[in-house]
Amino acid sequence: MGEQIRTDYDLLVDDPSLSCTPASVSRIWANPNSRIKITEQSDAIEISYEFFDLRRRIPVGDDSVMSDSPSTKNLSGTLFAEMGSSFAFYEGSTLIIESRNHAPGYIRTSRGIPQSPNTVAIEELEVRDGELHITHTYRDESLFEVPLVLEYSFRRIEAEDVDIYSCTDADYDWFLDLNNKSDGK
């Protein structure tokens, strides 16, 4: 099933970013040069992403603290089920975030790798040698024969806050124009 969804995917039409919608948590972590701020509250982890002005509030505890509502919204208050409903807990010094209840969509928009309401995503965040390392594992037996594992590393910068992104709807006309020029049209 996952391979058929991937085959049918058309980046120039199906990419949710064109309407300022985050495709998935993985897509947000992977966006280059966008600031991310992580803060720990007494009962939750809060992650602010510059990309799409997203704010993610993740309760700390077991799955009983996870809401049925999405954990992520933008500054306008729009909730994004593509990012799932999450809860967090610690194993030693590693922060683990588990997300479920995803809207159907794409883990990776460049390749059309899908996610479904059955997808369970585990993010393991650990600081090593002054860098934040994230191992992000997606499991969904209806889509994948083996789990999809992605890894990211981030360096801390001096900035305290994330910038405002102010997303506006977009299109891939620039990409089509570029390809037409290279085709001699």
Question: What are the residue ranges of the model-derived segments?
Answer:
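PEST-like low-complexity, intrinsically disordered acidic/proline/serine-rich tracts
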Residues: 1-185
